[in-house]
Amino acid sequence: MQPVLNIDDVKRVEVGLTRAGVSVSELMHRAGCAVAQEVLELGAKKVVVFCGMGNNGGDGWVCAEALLSRGVDVQVVTPIDPDQLSGDLARQVAQSAVRAGVPALEGPSREEVLETLDEADTIVDCMLGTGFHGTVRTPFDIWIECVNSSDARVVAVDVPSGLSAQSGLAEGPCVIADMTVTMISLKPGLLADAGRDACGVIVVAPLAEQTERLVVEADPVAWRTDLADYLDVVCEPTAAQDKFSRGSVLVVGGSSRFPGAPIMAARAAARAGAGYVTLAVPNTIVPPVQSHLLEIPVVGLPCDVEGVLTAEAAEKVVALAEHNSATLIGPGMRVAGGPVACVNALLRSEAPLVVDADGLNCLARLTENNITEFPELTRREAPLVLTPHRRELGRLVGRADNPPVSLEEQLECARDVVWTDGGSGIVVVAKASATACVGVDQAVMPKPGPAALATAGSGDVLAGMMASYLAQAHGEASDLPLLCALVCEVHGYAGTLAAEAFGTRGVMAGDLIDRIGLAADVIEEHAFVPEGAGEQA
């Protein structure tokens, strides 16, 4: 897995490297040369390097000099005379590059910038680094617009200019790069929100042999998975299995208003490999729900005249859960006294449990929108997986009016939940543009899914898959956050396959379900044989 560090922790690693004998000037030299090497491997012939006035700009000057030494036609665009740079190190490397023969275009107009870019095949963005946040100022806002209007490929250094490497948010114009060469470690902002579209392919340049050790000691905020990491949690089907040994799933949910959500969740659980799936819904919707499910039995539960579960359903739900390997509660269930009672009863049982959608909203009501004040509810021996999107997560931790808006905040809120009881088998699958599967010991980030997943019902499908994989592990996953990440990865690839069939805009949640099995085969195959996995998964 690849570590993800907050910006402050990256700075601490840099301090550790200097104490280990790697000077700041040497780090800048290595960073610039690492970028130059990536540019050379792209086959660049004519390169324009945009340099800012800080150390990120210094990396650009080093890169330009390295490219010139390899015979590349290179030019630097700088806001001021290199001799006027205030930072000693940036000024020194800029002066060195100029002495070596790197031409510099100082304080150009928009027209001059556009003219310079006309014949360039590659642009290197070194305007604003990881310390940037807020609004981009002139001239960099103009330069960013020029870069984004160019047909040349774009390589960003550390972070695309205009993007916060910590939050992943861009308040104004932001460079849209084809590749980002980031130093030392991945940062949260590169992986989520605006960073998803801005960074392109991300390459990590470690800069020193001591980096790996120092990064681990810095306690990464999260870990980004590679396919081979899933080997420990993949449950390979065998010819000796029967439907019972493959695990059984109970899905509880639905209402007269939302009968479709539990249907999708139950079908997804079956497609994800569970040997037996049972769907429990309000009595009033059993006939129409059963008509959509040939392979999945439907059980009726007590409900009111509006087709919402009543408190009397709780006892029956727990009894059903005791006979299944894992239970999912929530899809389409509504928020009322009866559903709240069902969620409460299941939390107090020993059933391996996935809580999604209105199950989470019932949990928020049960805990008065502050789950951290009710540790007894999540303190259980059996696994508990919560799958909130950002708004649902906000409701759980007292931030209903101020839900998390970034991966950074998402991780903080999820940790508030999992640390509530001091340690248990709980995992929060915090869903967003970048999903994090947060356990007590670590947060695991799967490869993010495609834009096609942004459709109603996609979360119901994921929840059904979560329950299915938990059931196949018989509620005893050795690494529950990693298992949850595997499910997210399969879900994402199912979205990719669906988009190939229907187009990104045309995918509906039901299209994902019938591709779950194929997606799982591909992901699991490449987990065992990771070579070339990136070409397909």
Place the predicted regions along the sequence by residue.
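Internal gly/pro-rich beta-alpha loop/helix module
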Residues: 121-122, 127-220
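Small-residue (G/A/S/T)-rich helix-start motifs and N-terminal tracts that mark the onset
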Residues: 1-79, 86, 190-357, 361-386, ...
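A short, aliphatic-rich alpha-helical micro-motif
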Residues: 117-121, 147, 174, 321-322, ...
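Nucleotide and nucleotide-moiety/phosphate-recognizing core
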Residues: 37-127, 133-157, 341-342
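Short acidic loop-to-helix transition motifs that present clustered carboxylates
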Residues: 108-112, 161-165, 188, 360-362
